[in-house]
UniProtKB/Swiss-Prot annotation:
This is Small ribosomal subunit protein uS5. With S4 and S12 plays an important role in translational accuracy. Located at the back of the 30S subunit body where it stabilizes the conformation of the head with respect to the body. Keywords: Ribonucleoprotein, Ribosomal protein, RNA-binding, rRNA-binding. Signal peptide: none annotated. The N-terminal domain interacts with the head of the 30S subunit; the C-terminal domain interacts with the body and contacts protein S4. The interaction surface between S4 and S5 is involved in control of translational fidelity. Residues 17-80 form the S5 DRBM domain. One of its GO terms (biological process) is translation. One of its GO terms (molecular function) is structural constituent of ribosome. Gene3D superfamilies: 3.30.160.20, 3.30.230.10. SUPFAM superfamilies: dsRNA-binding domain-like, Ribosomal protein S5 domain 2-like. It holds the Pfam family Ribosomal_S5.
Length: 173
């Protein structure tokens, strides 16, 4: 009874961004006069074309917490380069005790990922990926670890620029 279902839910808006609610938790603050109940919501927002953001909102009521989380998600968006609906290379990410490994997948594979990671990939616009999480299964830590991994992904042109070579040299070497 202390937790709500961590099912992912769609929320509708008209600005062209996809919104997913990952988790809503009931939280309590114990004071001298008793307990104060509140809610914490975790959401992700993306444009389906490589931009994604996450946010956490807290309030006394669920709708207000979700609204705050959605607004924070819109403010915290990052850009991720995609290649034909997947990522360019294998990346690892970590936050707290949660670590995730994201592997690119061929077309038709689909999103093979658990829980909170799946919601991030759906709003990001990734259609084919294989992801594995290790350690903590806390939704907040898993989403933060996924964002850490996505921030570490690079394009072949970025790798070539760092090495002072052309993109063709990177693939032939």
């Amino acid at each position: 009874m202390a937790k709500f279902s961590p099912k992912v839910q769609d929320e509708g808006r008209d600005d062209g961004l996809r919104e997913k609610m990952i988790a809503v938790n009931r939280v309590t603050k114990v004071v001298k006069g008793g307990r104060i109940l509140g809610f914490a919501a975790l959401t992700v927002v993306g444009d389906g074309d490589g931009r994604v953001g996450m946010g956490k909102g807290k309030s006394k009521e669920v709708p207000a917490a979700v609204q705050k989380a959605m607004e924070e998600s819109r403010r915290n968006m990052i850009k991720v380069s995609l290649k034909h609906g997947t990522i360019h290379h294998t990346v690892m990410g970590q936050h707290g005790a949660a670590s995730v490994m994201l592997n690119p997948a061929p077309k038709g594979t689909g999103i093979i990922a658990g829980g909170p990671m799946r919601a991030v990939f759906e709003v990001l616009g990734i259609t084919d990926i294989v992801a594995k999480s290790h350690g903590s299964s806390n939704p907040y830590n898993m989403v933060r670890a996924t964002f850490d991994a996505l921030k570490h992904s690079t394009t072949p042109s970025e790798v070539a620029a760092k090495r002072g070579k052309s993109v063709e040299d990177i693939f032939t070497a």
